Amino acid sequence: MSTLSVVIKDITPEQVAIISQGLVAGVDEVGRGPLIGDVVTAAVILDPNKPIVGLNDSKKLSEKRRNALYQQIMDNALSVSVGRASPAEIDELNILHATMLAMQRAVAGLSILPERVLVDGNRVPDFGIASHAIIKGDGLVAAISAASIIAKVTRDAEMDTLDSQYPQYGFAKHKGYPTKAHFEALALYGVLPDHRKSFKPVADRILLQNTF
């Protein structure tokens, strides 16, 4: 963690207002838990002159509402950037370090240099600028909520694309997470190139494939 970063727990509305002033980038990730695909992160700098009503943790929003807010964010934010780490990078680095790398890529891709970066969770990669990790920040800080929506809609769309290529795996429904349906598909159809081979259910299936 950078010496410029701070972890904030139990943040007050007053603190949110203070640290949200100026050019602030909110950052969040989606896809740490799935067995397949990229971990996707987003960085968003909102326009204070164009407030977006209804921003919240993407997991608490319906798909229809997320998609509507996604378009509003894309149309009204000062800058939006998506960063990702591939399954190969996840296998090489581990999911935590790959997520930190993806966050760095998202911030680096912004068209405007933020004065401060606010990240959901309790860890912050080194952005080289002042940054704060805010526990449950995706439900508290508008810029982080916006980032969570961008990341979620982006990754879900990628899972829908994967579903069209491999409909027997059911990716459109479980989004690659370790559900019963996903385990059954792994057992029946095997491991795909985009599966994270360092994740135990996938590694176990590879071992079984190589045994017979």
UniProtKB/Swiss-Prot annotation:
Binding annotation for a divalent metal cation: 28-29, 120
Domain of life: Bacteria
Enzyme category, top tier: hydrolase
The keyword Ribosomal protein is assigned to this record: no
Catalytic activity: Endonucleolytic cleavage to 5'-phosphomonoester
Every RNase H type-2 domain range: 22-211
Cofactor: Mn(2+); Mg(2+)
Cofactor note: Manganese or magnesium. Binds 1 divalent metal ion per monomer in the absence of substrate. May bind a second metal ion after substrate binding.
Family per similarity comment: Belongs to the RNase HII family.
UniProt name for this protein: Ribonuclease HII
Originating species: Shewanella frigidimarina (strain NCIMB 400)
